[in-house]
């Protein structure tokens, strides 16, 4: 396979490398308040575009079916809001005897308590071809559930989720009713559109990361915390994969994809305001914020890199299940 053909096939991975390099060279372009105004273009326009895109591409029956998939919702919410923070707390009891900065460890604990984001898990699920409708419900519900029970103003959370998730999704569904035949005939590249939006999110996320003011943190602690975060993400993704692919789990391969991403992703948009309120007045707030600031780009980067692998598994698994369900033709003697 030639280089150009390889790049065309793996354009998304190449795109990730390019946007990260661009963010490193000139982070001021994509930071909050910069020329791109990500606080508007990403928080509102890009997220709204994602869910309008989902409303256009998803059949109403798929959304209804996902809403009624109570077992999947319980799995994701219990893993995210109960298992995740509990497991992190137990892990930190071991790390507390190490020389790692105690405020970084407190930051890791807060990461475990954060709600899921409303965009990255949905885009990655769509990129793989998983149960996008279930990902939409769980991402929005998890953010609303934990966000509304925290110190962050309830009205602010509700209005933002309503305007950027619910309204675009409904509008997409309404538009779909009128252009349904055209959509089925032309088959627009919804997955590619969502992937391009994700590249925008990755770019602005890394702009914020690279432009972040210098924090009084030794390189050893920083390297260790990055290693721990990637290890935690990989371990939890593997755990959700194991739990959701058991023979008696009742989940399809597409469900598993949604579960993997929705159960392990954490929100920076809700997370930072929550930290600023809960730890207001703490001189070590910047250190407490470091794990979340690392976790957010790490989850997007890791998830994006794993898209081809997870997609390959899902397709092969779906084919295998289809073959096992086909009726056996009796052999004539």
Swiss-Prot record:
Stretches in topological domain Cytoplasmic: 1-10, 59-71, 125-126, 173-189, 244-258, 308-333
GO MF annotation: an example: symporter activity
Similarity-based family: Belongs to the bile acid:sodium symporter (BASS) (TC 2.A.28) family.
Top-level taxon in the UniProt lineage: Eukaryota
UniProt keyword Transport present: yes
Entry function: Involved in teeth and skeletal development. Has an essential role in the biosynthesis and trafficking of glycosaminoglycans and glycoproteins to produce a proper functioning extracellular matrix. Required for extracellular matrix mineralization. Also involved in the regulation of cellular calcium homeostasis. Does not show transport activity towards bile acids or steroid sulfates.
Alphabetical keyword list: Cell membrane, Endoplasmic reticulum, Golgi apparatus, Ion transport, Membrane, Sodium, Sodium transport, Symport, Transmembrane, Transmembrane helix, Transport
Residues on Extracellular side: 32-37, 93-103, 148-151, 211-222, 280-286
The organism's taxonomic lineage, starting at the top: Eukaryota, Metazoa, Chordata, Craniata, Vertebrata
Membrane-related topology note: Multi-pass membrane protein
Protein name: Sodium/bile acid cotransporter 7
GO BP term (any one): sodium ion transport
Gene3D superfamilies per UniProt: 1.20.1530.20
GO CC field: endoplasmic reticulum membrane; Golgi membrane; plasma membrane
Subcellular location: Cell membrane; Endoplasmic reticulum membrane; Golgi apparatus membrane
């Amino acid at each position: 396979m030639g280089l150009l053909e390889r790049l065309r096939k793996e354009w998304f991975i190449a795109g990730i490398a390019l946007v990260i390099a661009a963010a490193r060279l000139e982070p001021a372009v994509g930071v909050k308040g910069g020329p791109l105004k990500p606080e508007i273009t990403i928080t509102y326009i890009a997220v709204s575009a994602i869910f309008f895109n989902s409303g256009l591409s998803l059949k109403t029956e798929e959304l209804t079916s996902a809403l009624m998939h109570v077992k999947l919702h319980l799995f994701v919410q219990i893993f995210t809001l109960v298992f995740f923070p509990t497991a992190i707390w137990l892990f930190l009891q071991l790390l507390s005897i190490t020389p790692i900065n105690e405020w970084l460890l407190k930051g890791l604990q807060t990461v475990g308590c954060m709600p899921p984001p409303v965009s990255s898990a949905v885009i990655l699920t769509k990129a793989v071809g998983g149960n996008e409708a279930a990902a939409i419900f769980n991402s929005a519900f998890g953010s609303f559930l934990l966000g509304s029970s925290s110190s962050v103003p309830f009205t602010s959370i509700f209005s933002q989720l309503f305007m950027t998730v619910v309204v675009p999704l409904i509008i997409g569904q309404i538009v779909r009713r009128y252009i349904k035949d055209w959509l089925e005939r032309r088959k627009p590249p919804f997955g590619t559109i969502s992937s391009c939006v994700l590249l925008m999110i990755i770019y602005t996320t890394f702009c914020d990361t690279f432009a972040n003011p210098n924090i009084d943190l030794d390189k050893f602690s920083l390297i260790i915390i990055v290693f721990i975060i990637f290890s935690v993400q990989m371990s939890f993704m593997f755990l959700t994969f194991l739990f959701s692919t058991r023979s008696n789990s009742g989940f399809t391969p597409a469900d598993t994809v949604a579960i993997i991403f929705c159960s392990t992703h954490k929100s920076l948009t809700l997370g930072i305001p929550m930290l600023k309120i809960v730890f207001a007045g703490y001189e070590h707030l910047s250190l407490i914020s470091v794990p979340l600031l690392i976790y957010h780009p790490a989850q997007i980067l890791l998830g994006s890199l794993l898209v081809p692998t997870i997609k390959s598994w899902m397709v092969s698994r779906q084919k295998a299940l289809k073959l096992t369900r086909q009726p056996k033709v009796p052999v004539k003697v």
